């Protein structure tokens, strides 16, 4: 059985990146919550 985590920077950015977050209303909510919490990194 293969390991399930096969990292790919491109896929990672497309799913969890800043532009992906900005594309949807809920994604923008995620960013604003992380800003309010004071996260150093908003996205990956």
Curated annotation (Swiss-Prot):
GO cellular component, one term: ribonucleoprotein complex
PROSITE patterns assigned: RIBOSOMAL_L34
A Pfam family reported for this protein in Swiss-Prot or TrEMBL: Ribosomal_L34
Record GO biological process: translation
Record's keyword terms, sorted: Ribonucleoprotein, Ribosomal protein
GO MF annotations, alphabetized: structural constituent of ribosome
Annotated segments matching region Disordered: 24-44
Annotated signal sequence range: none
Gene3D superfamilies: 1.10.287.3980
Record has Chloroplast as a keyword: no
Comp. bias regions, Basic residues: 31-44
Family per record: Belongs to the bacterial ribosomal protein bL34 family.
Protein's recorded name: Large ribosomal subunit protein bL34
Record gene name: rpmH
């Amino acid at each position: 059985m293969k390991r399930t985590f096969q990292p790919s920077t491109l896929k990672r950015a497309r799913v969890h990146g800043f532009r992906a977050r900005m594309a949807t209303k809920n994604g923008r909510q995620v960013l604003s919550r992380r800003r309010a919490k004071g996260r150093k990194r908003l996205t990956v």
